Amino acid sequence: MEAIKNKMQAMKLEKDNAIDRAEIAEQKSRDANLRAEKSEEEVRGLQKKIQQIENELDQVQESLTQANTKLEEKEKSLQTAEGDVAALNRRIQLIEEDLERSEGRLKIATSKLEEASQSADESERMRKMLEHRSITDEERMEGLESQLKEARMMAEDADRKYDEVARKLAMVEADLERAEERAETGESKIVELEEELRVVGNNLKSLEVSEEKAQQREEAYEQQIRIMTTKLKEAEARAEFAERSVQKLQKEVDRLEDELVHEKEKYKSISDELDQTFAELTGY
């Protein structure tokens, strides 16, 4: 009987212990459920935050793509502008070379005109001296004929010089198509000068040219000098225009360089913002 009681007490004690363990297990189960629910809530929060970060990352990447596209467009525009600048520089160089050749022609023509004027003046002075001498004196007539021969030689030498200049001008004409009309005008004037020199030779030969005709030739020379002076002024005006074009082109180059610097700074700012955003995302 005593053994049964002891066994009953042991069973009761075991029952109580089992109940306690069951309550503890239930409490642990409730605690585990609470922790699981809290963990699930945290997971949902993290997933939501990750989704939000991914959306922001997509927006940032899209902005970066747009910025890169704009930058590429700006670089293409800049390359096009640089090509235009190079073309303008080549064009200005050609204009300057054309102007230099024109100025060379003008100097040659001016020098030729001066030589013609000097020869004509010398011939005119000789003609006046011959007119005032008495042609009845045989010895003086021989002297006049000798001077006339010298004048003819001077005129022929001038003709040879003018022929040489004309050949040089003809060679230059092949490289100066834009100034062809001016060259033709210059050659026409050279022919006129040669014709006037031949007239001077005839005057020296015949001694019958009057003072009025000499005055007309002098006026013609002065008119040709005025024409040459006008051409020189035109050449100087073209040089000034070319210089203004170069200055304008330099301003355009400076503006494009400033725009390029601005775009580079803008691109650097965007890159810095992206780096900062990536750093913040990495920190999460």
Swiss-Prot record:
Keyword annotations: Allergen, Coiled coil, Repeat
Pfam families: Tropomyosin (PF00261)
Span list, region Disordered: 22-43
InterPro entries from the UniProt entry: Tropomyosin
Segments forming a coiled coil: 1-284
Family affiliation: Belongs to the tropomyosin family.
Domain notes: The molecule is in a coiled coil structure that is formed by 2 polypeptide chains. The sequence exhibits a prominent seven-residues periodicity.
Subunit structure: Homodimer.
Role according to the record: Tropomyosin, in association with the troponin complex, plays a central role in the calcium dependent regulation of muscle contraction.
Protein name: Tropomyosin
Protein species of origin: Lepidoglyphus destructor (Storage mite)
